[in-house]
Amino acid sequence: MAQFMVTAAYTDSAFAGMANNPHNREEAIGKILSALNMNLESLHMTLGGKLFMVVSGSAEAAGSLRIVAGASGSVTDITVDEVFLAADQVDWMQSASAVMGAYKPANA
C-alpha cells in the first residue's frame, strides 16, 4: 500500500467543538480511514493548530479522504501527498543518472 502524508489546519469552530466536548480525535479519524480501507500509521498535532498524519492505502482512497475532510468544514489547508522512504531516493538517483544525457533542457 502507498503511504500519504496528510496535513490540515483546524478551523476556529473545530477548536470550539473540541473545547466544548473534549474527545480523542484519533478515534473519529480512524472511522473515516476504516471506511476508506486505509490505515493510520501516525497522528500528530502541532501547537499551531495543525494536524499531521501518515496514512496508508490506495491513491483513490487518499483522494476521497481529501474530499471528505474538506467537506467536513472542520479543517482547511488540506494537503495529501504520497510519501516514500528516504532509501527509495537511491533508486531514483540511479535512474536519473542513466537518462540525464538524453534530456535537452528547453533553455539549452
Listing of model-derived features with the role each one plays in the protein:
Residues 45-55:
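Amphipathic, hydrophobic secondary-structure cores in small proteins
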